C-alpha cells in the first residue's frame, strides 16, 4: 500500500516516468505501472530481478526490470522526459553515496535536471553514524545539490528492525 501511495503522490506532482533505484522486489515500479507511469526498475541482485520478471509476467504489468548496477547504468537510454527517481537506501546507511551518483548522472543528461524529481526514503531513528535527521537524514545532500522539498509523506513502512515508526519519504526537485 505504501508503494502505491508514493507512486500516486509522484503522479499528482506531474511526473511521467518512474525509475526505482535499488528496487528490491519492484513494488514501487509495479505500482507506478498500474498508475500508467512508464516505469523502470534498476536492481543489482539477479534473484530479485528474476522475482520482478515473474511478477511482470504473472500480472501482465511490465515495469521494465533491469539487472544492473545503478551507479554504472546509462539512464540516457531510457529517453526520460519528466521522471521521478525513487532512491532506495537510507542516507546514513550508504544511500547518500548512491543518491549523489544518481544526481550526477541526471545532471549529465541535457535538459533532464529541471524536469526531474527525486524521492528519498528517510529515517527519524538516531543511529551511531547518523547526523542531522531533518528531512529524514537527507538535509545535507538536499542542500548540497540545491534541491527543493516538495512534500514529505510518512508511511507505515519499516526499513530496519530498530525503526518501529513510520518512514518519511521526501519528494524533491532541482531548484
Describe the residue ranges of each PLM region:
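Glycine-rich SAM-binding Motif I of class I
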Residues: 26-30
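A short SAM/SAH-binding and catalytic strip from SAM-dependent methyltransferases
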Residues: 82-98
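Conserved class I S-adenosyl-L-methionine
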Residues: 15-24
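Conserved SAM-binding motif I beta-strand of class I
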Residues: 38-43
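S-adenosyl-L-methionine
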Residues: 1-13, 53-80
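C-terminal substrate-binding/active-site "lid" region of AdoMet-derived donor-dependent transferases
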Residues: 96-166
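Short alpha-helix immediately C-terminal to the canonical SAM-binding loop
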Residues: 49-50
